[in-house]
Regions:
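Catalytic core of soluble alpha/beta enzymes
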Residues: 176, 196-199
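Short, glycine/acidic-rich beta->alpha junctions
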Residues: 56-60, 196
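Short gly/pro/ser/thr-enriched loop/turn and capping motifs at secondary-structure boundaries
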Residues: 19-20, 83-86, 198
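Polyanionic/metal-chelating signatures
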Residues: 60-189
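Short beta->alpha linker loops
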Residues: 170, 195-196
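Feature captures the catalytic cores and cofactor-binding loops of soluble hydro-lyases/lyases
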Residues: 23, 186, 199
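Short internal beta-strands
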Residues: 190-194
Length: 199
């Protein structure tokens, strides 16, 4: 970059955030980061919605963008964490544009205690449901009970083809299971949180 003698300030990454997806976190009508379907809305397991694309609700006119830019932040990864397989996010420049960088989406998986209510109160069930979803997306069996919608299968197939997933996980035993899952399905995972790795 030739700045012709002018000072340059590097932009910082704001991490995985809800900037532009929520204004006031305690005001439900201003929070678009998570899909909160009520049980029975569709008859499908509500914790597995890989087709939910949180970038579609991104508001580049949010007042929080200006605050982030003043703090030196120039881009962020929009994330969703409302469910076990909670949907997709993407990296966004905080420059007022609407589209994720390169148009790419990254799926989010959330494992652990915070999702026990959505998975029969068992971490083992979380991994069971994820494996069933991956298998169903690869080769759905006619007449088999469906965990995913048709769009969900397509979204998960595309995600598996791109091989990138962000996984929110903290407990060491859960991290080990995530790595086994990644190896089994030949996907790459980036761990979010991973608090057990800090010990």
């Amino acid at each position: 970059v030739d700045a012709q003698g002018k000072p340059l300030t590097p932009g910082l990454f704001a991490g995985i955030s809800h900037i532009g997806l929520e204004e006031i976190s305690q005001e439900d009508s201003s929070v678009d980061a998570n899909l909160n379907l009520k049980t029975g809305d569709t008859g499908l397991i509500e914790t597995l919605r890989p087709e939910f694309d949180v970038t579609r609700a991104y508001n580049p006119r949010s007042t929080l963008l200006a605050v982030a830019r003043v703090g030196g932040m120039s881009f962020t990864a929009l994330g969703t964490d409302g469910a076990l397989l909670s949907g997709q996010g993407g990296v966004i420049r905080l420059d007022g544009g609407y589209e994720p960088i390169a148009g790419k989406r990254v799926p989010f998986i959330s494992i652990g205690a915070g999702k026990l209510g959505q998975s029969g109160s068992s971490r083992a069930a979380q991994f069971m449901l994820l494996e069933q979803a991956f298998n169903e997306a690869k080769a759905p069996t006619p007449g088999d009970e469906r965990l995913l919608t048709g769009q969900g299968r397509n979204a998960l197939n595309q995600a598996m083809a791109s091989q990138r997933f962000l996984v929110s996980v903290n407990r060491e035993a859960d991290i080990r299971q995530v790595l086994k899952l990644a190896q089994k399905y030949a996907i790459r995972v980036a761990l979010v949180g991973a608090l057990a790795c800090l010990a």
